[in-house]
Regions:
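Transmembrane alpha-helix entry/boundary detector in multi-pass membrane proteins
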Residues: 12-23, 80-91, 112-117, 132-152, ...
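Canonical alpha-helical transmembrane segments
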Residues: 27-45, 97-106, 155-164
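C-terminal transmembrane-bundle signature of multipass membrane proteins
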Residues: 1-2, 23-24, 30-34, 144-239
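N-terminal topogenic module of multi-pass integral membrane proteins
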Residues: 1-86
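Transmembrane helix-loop junctions in multipass membrane proteins, especially transporters and channels
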Residues: 41-45, 74-78, 107-108, 135-136, ...
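Alpha-helical transmembrane segments of multi-pass integral membrane proteins
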Residues: 55-71, 87-101, 115-131, 147-158, ...
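Juxtamembrane "helix-exit" motif on the non-cytosolic side of transmembrane helices
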Residues: 2-10, 68-79, 128-140, 192-203
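Membrane-interface helix-boundary motifs at transmembrane edges
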Residues: 42-51, 104-115, 165-175
Length: 239
C-alpha cells in the first residue's frame, strides 16, 4: 500500500489507501448520524438539529479523520524525538475524539466546553513543530513552505474560532477569526483538492502524504461550515 519516492525521501500512497480512509470515515459518520436520528425519535431530551447541524456534521467527520489518521502515517524521520512522536499521535487521536464530541454538541445546539477546543489547537502546535523537525536545513523548510504556512493558518483559525464557538469573543477576535478562516479555507483547499485528484489518478510526484491531504480536505469542509454557521457571529460589530 505504501511506496517511497527515493529522490525526495517523501512518502506517498496510491489510491487504494485513499479509498480506504474515505470508506472508514464515511461508515463511521453514517453510523453516528443514524444514532443521532434514533435518539431524536425516542423520548430522550435532545434538541432537534439547529442551524449548527452542518457545522456539527463537519466536526464529526473531521474528528473521525483525525482519530484514524495515525493508522495511515508513515515513519516520521529520526530527526524527531520519539517522545514528540508519541505526543503527536496521542494528541491527534484525542483531538479527533474532541471534534466528534464537539460535533454532537453543535448538532444539538449546545455550547461546548472551552477545554474541548483547546486540545485540537494543541495538536496542531505539535503537528507544526514535528513538521519543522522533519525537514533538515532551511532548504528543506523552504521547499515545503506551503505546508508550514497552511499549518500556521489552521492553527490560528482553531485558536481564535474556539472563542467564537464558546460564545466569549474578545476584542477584535471576530475580525481576526474571519481573516484566519478565509486564509485557512484557501490554504487547505490548495493542499487537499489538487493533490487528492493527482493521488487518485496515480500521479506520484506529490510531497504530501495521503493522511495530510485527507485531513486538509475535511478541514476545508469544517472551515467552510464554520463560515456558514457562524456568519452572523463573526460579522457583528462589537460595541
Amino acid at each position: 500500500m505504501f511506496m517511497t519516492d527515493g529522490s525526495t525521501g517523501f512518502y506517498y500512497e496510491n489510491y487504494e489507501s485513499t479509498s480506504l480512509v474515505f470508506t472508514i470515515i464515511t461508515i463511521v459518520s453514517v453510523v453516528l448520524m443514524v444514532a443521532l436520528s434514533i435518539l431524536n425519535k425516542q423520548n430522550i431530551k435532545i434538541a432537534p438539529p439547529k442551524p449548527n447541524a452542518f457545522l456539527g456534521i463537519s466536526q464529526i467527520m473531521l474528528g473521525v479523520c483525525l482519530a484514524i489518521e495515525p493508522l495511515f502515517v508513515n515513519d516520521i524521520p529520526s530527526t524527531v524525538p520519539n517522545a514528540l512522536k508519541t505526543i503527536k499521535v496521542v494528541l491527534i487521536v484525542v483531538a479527533g475524539i474532541s471534534f466528534v464530541v464537539l460535533g454532537f454538541l453543535n448538532f444539538i445546539d449546545k455550547t461546548p466546553n472551552y477545554i474541548l477546543l483547546i486540545i485540537p489547537t494543541l495538536s496542531y502546535v505539535i503537528r507544526l513543530l514535528v513538521t519543522f523537525l522533519c525537514y533538515t536545513g532551511m532548504s528543506g523548510i523552504a521547499s515545503n513552505i506551503y505546508e508550514i504556512v497552511n499549518l500556521c493558518f489552521v492553527l490560528g483559525f482553531l485558536h481564535f474560532s474556539s472563542k467564537i464557538l464558546c460564545g466569549v469573543p474578545g476584542k477584535n477576535t471576530k475580525a481576526i477569526t474571519r481573516t484566519f478562516a478565509y486564509l485557512s479555507l484557501i490554504s487547505t483547499s490548495i493542499c487537499s483538492i489538487p493533490n487528492m485528484i493527482t493521488t487518485i489518478f496515480g500521479n506520484t510526484n506529490i510531497h504530501l502524504s495521503v493522511d495530510s491531504i485527507i485531513t486538509n480536505l475535511f478541514m476545508t469542509i469544517y472551515v467552510f461550515a464554520f463560515l456558514i454557521s457562524k456568519k452572523q457571529e463573526i460579522e457583528e460589530t462589537i460595541e
